[in-house]
Amino acid sequence: MPVSRMRMRPWLEMQINSNQIPGLIWINKDKMIFQIPWKHAAKHGWDMEKDACLFRSWAIHTGRYKVGEKDPDPKTWKANFRCAMNSLPDIEEVKDKSINKGSSAVRVYRMLPPLTKDQKKERKSKSSREARNKSKRKLYEDMRMEESAERLTSTPLPDDHSSYTAHDYTGQEVEVENTSITLDLSSCEVSGSLTDWRMPMEIAMADSTNDIYQLQVSPLGSSSEDEDEMKSNIIKLLEPTQDWHTTSVEGKGFFTNEPGTQTMCSTFGYKEQDGEIDTSSAELEFRMMDQKSSLDFSWLDTVRPMQAISCSL
């Protein structure tokens, strides 16, 4: 049979009023606000009689620790005390006044007024209603999971697997269509000669290498010959055109390269026997004629006659 003990709130009030635990005091007794020393053991170190005496007293009160039977465990005492404080419905923490760091760390709590019978009943009914709803919801989910599992495991597989295939009427339609196609093909006449509808096409094939083809490729010429021919053509294009023409003025023959001048025949005596030119009757002189000048050639008399150049007309 469990040992009856005082609940935490009256026990805590008795400890505060006794003033036997250092740091456990009332801040505002009218508002039921008090503080508890809450030093961090790992960072600042604990004094068993000063910092952990409240947690040890609660462990002894709940029977979790007995002096001489177990080794002291201040961290476990503090964790158990914190869980018990958080589970109380009529005590809440005043977080804006608590100090969580440093050697003077404390937690401030407020004791709420005791609940009336109506509040207790309402709270109890609310909690019981929430518990019932939760249990019903869980039961419904479990039933659904069990039904789905049974449906998967208990579904029998048929011995005849013909139901997995397509229906028979589709195959019948296909067979009828195939029969009609076969009948149509049997009525057709197949001719072995295709010359009636194919257009004639003649392909000329070369019988030997001597045949002349429409498309011939000339052999590539030598690169040196092409370069020489190209150079000579460029030189001819760059050189000025000098077409020498024979003309005769006052019985004298001349060579001229000016375009637009009048061309006259010179008086030459030509011997067919030896192919020489007789220049006794006329003297050939080079004269530069200007097509814009007049036909007055009186100034030519002052020019010294030059040696005649033979030419063949």
From Swiss-Prot:
Residue ranges crossing the lipid bilayer per the database entry: none
CDD domains reported for this sequence: IRF
Gene Ontology terms for molecular function: DNA-binding transcription factor activity, RNA polymerase II-specific; RNA polymerase II cis-regulatory region sequence-specific DNA binding
Subcellular location: Nucleus; Cytoplasm
PROSITE patterns: IRF_1, IRF_2
Cellular component terms (Gene Ontology): cytoplasm; nucleus
Sequence ranges of Basic and acidic residues compositional bias: 117-150
InterPro entries given in the database record: Interferon_reg_fac_CS (IPR019817), Interferon_reg_fact_DNA-bd_dom (IPR001346), IRF1/IRF2 (IPR017431), WH-like_DNA-bd_sf (IPR036388), WH_DNA-bd_sf (IPR036390)
DNA-binding region(s), chain positions: 5-113
Keyword terms, alphabetized: Activator, Cytoplasm, DNA-binding, Isopeptide bond, Nucleus, Transcription, Transcription regulation, Ubl conjugation
GO annotation terms (biological process): immune system process; regulation of transcription by RNA polymerase II
Region (Disordered): 110-162
Covalent cross-link site, Glycyl lysine isopeptide (Lys-Gly) (interchain with G-Cter in SUMO): K271, K292
Stored Pfam families: IRF
Post-translational modification: Phosphorylated by CK2 and this positively regulates its activity.
Superkingdom of the source species: Eukaryota
Functional description taken from the UniProt entry: Transcriptional regulator that specifically binds to the upstream regulatory region of type I IFN and IFN-inducible MHC class I genes (the interferon consensus sequence (ICS)) and activates those genes. Acts as a tumor suppressor.
Family: Belongs to the IRF family.
Name by which UniProt lists this protein: Interferon regulatory factor 1
Native organism: Gallus gallus (Chicken)
Primary gene name: IRF1
